[in-house]
Every structure is written in structure tokens, then in C-alpha cells.
Amino acid sequence: MPRSQRNDNFIDKTFTIVADILLRIIPTTQREKEAFTYYRDGMSAQSEGEYAEALLNYYEAMRLEIDPYDRSYILYNIGLIHTSNGEHVKALEYYFQALERNPSLPQALNNMAVICHYRGEQAIEQGDSENSEIWFDQAASYWKQAIALAPNNYIEAENWLKITGRLKE
């Protein structure tokens, strides 16, 4: 049984009902409907911390979905799961793929910056100030791009850029 048919959460049930109604009204192909169902089930599983199940649903949604914009969000969510699992290299790969399909995805840029900043902090802890600066500069680059796309969404990142003197670069 699809996850969307066994939701116990009122909000999830409501979303599922509304989404099902929209899928009936909006002219879409059966393939698009199936892709959306897998995507929706992936989001539901992800929100409950069921990452393996979420990934299976997202991979199936990717197999079915042909629209690059919709694929970008599937890829972004796969990146989120890999980030949560500490698999930063994989996460970065999926964020890059998402941005290739949808360059206006500031949240992917932000998450890439957060990973780079984290790697910079790790380098400092290991006494590697040279690599930490490389990671911090990369984080700054991603945050600047995210801020350009969504100016009011990343205030903390903007403050970090100012404090570290990276805002002007």
C-alpha cells in the first residue's frame, strides 16, 4: 500500500486528499501522476525519518519524472537525506544536479555552503588553516549566490560574510 494511503497525520491526510483532487482535475499523464505519488510518498517518509524508504520513493520518482524543474526538487530532497546521513560528498553531487536543472534553487546553494563551512570548521580542528580557508571561500561563494536569489532568507550567512570580510569579494 502506498505511504500516502496510510498516513495517520491529519495534515498529511489533508495534503494527500488535496493533491489527489488536483491530480484528477489538472490534465496530466499517468506517468506524471505516478511520479508525483512517489515524490509525495518520499516526502512523507523523509519527514518521519524513514530515509531508506524515502530514497526508494525518490529514485522511482526520478525514473518516472521527465520535467527538469520537478526533477530538481527530487534531487534536492535526495541531497537533504545524504546531508542528514553525513554523506556530504553525495549530498553535494545531488545539490549540483538539482542546480543544473533549476539554477534558481537558493536552498541547494545554502546547503552546499553549510557543508563547505562545516568542512572548513573540521579543517581548523585538524590544524589545517590553509584548507579551512579554501572551504570557507567556497562556502562564501555559495552563500553569495543564495543571497542573490533570495536576499532576505539568509541573514545569518550574510552576517558571517560581513564578519569574515568575504561579502565584498
From Swiss-Prot:
Coiled coil: none annotated. It is found in: Plastid, Chloroplast thylakoid membrane. InterPro entries: PSI_Ycf3_assembly, TPR-like_helical_dom_sf, TPR_rpt. Belongs to the Ycf3 family. It comes from Staurastrum punctulatum (Green alga). GO terms for biological process: photosynthesis. Essential for the assembly of the photosystem I (PSI) complex. May act as a chaperone-like factor to guide the assembly of the PSI subunits. TPR repeats lie at residues 35-68, 72-105, 120-153. It is a peripheral membrane protein. Keywords: Chloroplast, Membrane, Photosynthesis, Plastid, Repeat, Thylakoid, TPR repeat. One of its GO terms (cellular component) is chloroplast thylakoid membrane. The gene is ycf3. It holds the Pfam family TPR_1. This is Photosystem I assembly protein Ycf3. Its main location: plastid.
